[in-house]
Design a protein with these regions (language model features):
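Short beta-alpha connecting loops at secondary-structure transitions
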Residues: 90-94, 122-131, 162-169, 188-190, ...
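N-terminal capping segment at the start of a domain
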Residues: 3-34
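Post-HExxH zinc-binding segment in Zn-dependent metallohydrolases
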Residues: 118, 129-158, 166-168, 172, ...
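Catalytic Zn2+-binding segment of zinc metalloproteases
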Residues: 110-124, 144
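C-terminal, non-catalytic "cap/extension" segments appended to globular domains
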Residues: 61-70, 105, 113, 143, ...
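Divalent metal-coordination and catalytic microenvironments
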Residues: 26, 107, 138, 183, ...
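Short pre-active-site segment immediately N-terminal to the catalytic Zn-binding motif
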Residues: 84-106
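Contiguous, non-catalytic segments that form substrate-binding/exosite surfaces or channel walls
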Residues: 31, 35, 43-90
Length: 313
């Protein structure tokens, strides 16, 4: 049975009882382990379209132990890449052998390669790339890994899990961060109109946005205060850059895989902070002054839903 994303949404809206928000991330999937040597090979194979120099740098990162891989007592949780001008980037991870860990390694190495190319091309004043483009290189690697896994995986259940992982990336990065940005704007609008910013008023703003963005499912009141634990709101309008960065990365990866040409993207990686972010992205083939990039990403989102529906329905 073939079903489109529009038909799937229509069915979700018609469900009795209504699909609830808290069930959104529940799924059945096979337990697949990803040991570190296998993950390293996956990341290398997925990024082959980026060329020989990129591959050699990945080899260096692994051989010279740029990555602090495993969990340890007293170690900070999560993962991040730290660029160090004049040396090489360092990556902190807490690798536990899951699919998500494989994507995290690809993601953080994307940051590291961006730092390396910028640091070795630009002077100290211009080496540091800006927040606007910070998540592009990391997400390009995630998209390339997704596409490689889908190309090589034959088990339908595993393919479904990979597709769902990709869709969740869209939801949490493109849609959810845009929701956050709209919430932030509405909070400023309330203040400008002389309205008091109380927990009650901000909860209502957030609830209404959740109901708008996720109109196909039931919204629980427990989600209303979610805004209060988002630290990014202390940096004005930080969050929308996740959505623009993700959209840009999807467009760049699609271009590389379709044309085989990564030259513009590789040049973009060298620019650091030497130009305005919008101008740097144009070098990689992305023009965020036009809607095409976001529309292209949303088209990939629709196509991914259609592909998942063919497996599940």
């Amino acid at each position: 049975m073939n079903i489109t994303s529009e038909e799937l949404l229509k069915e979700a809206r018609a469900l009795e009882p209504q699909l609830q928000q808290w069930r959104r991330t529940l799924h059945r999937h096979p337990e697949v382990g990803f040991d570190l040597p296998h993950t390293k090979e996956l990341v290398k194979k997925a990024t082959l379209p980026l060329g020989e120099e990129y591959q050699k740098l990945l080899d260096r990162a692994f051989a010279e132990r740029w990555v602090d891989v495993y969990e340890n007592d007293g170690k900070q949780s999560g993962a991040f890449s730290c660029g160090v001008f004049g040396v090489h980037p360092y990556v902190l991870m807490n690798y536990a052998g899951t699919l998500n860990d494989a994507f995290t390694l690809a993601h953080e190495l994307g940051h590291s390669m961006h730092s390396w190319f910028s640091d070795t091309t630009q002077d100290y004043v211009n080496h540091d790339y800006r927040i606007m483009v910070a998540e592009v290189a990391s997400t390009v690697n995630e998209v390339l890994l997704t596409k490689y896994l889908l190309k090589t995986e034959t088990d339908e259940k595993r393919r479904a899990y990979i597709l769902n992982h990709f869709l969740e990336s869209f939801r949490t990065t493109l849609y959810r961060q845009t929701l956050f940005a709209e919430f932030e704007r509405k909070a400023h609008d309330l203040y400008a109109a002389g309205q008091p910013l109380t927990a009650t008023s901000l909860n209502k703003v957030y609830h209404d946005l959740e109901a708008t963005y996720y109109d196909g499912i039931g919204i629980d009141a427990d989600i209303d205060p979610e805004w209060s634990y988002v630290p990014h709101f202390y940096r004005a309008f930080y969050v929308y850059q996740y959505a623009t960065g993700f959209s840009s990365a999807v467009a760049i990866a699609e271009h590389i895989l379709t044309t085989g040409d990564a030259s513009g993207y590789l040049k973009f990686l060298t620019t650091g902070g030497s130009d305005y972010p919008l101008e740097e992205l144009k070098i990689a083939g992305v023009d965020l002054t036009k809607p095409d990039t976001v529309r292209s990403a949303l088209r990939v989102f629709d196509e991914t839903i259609d592909e998942l529906a063919k497996i599940l329905l």
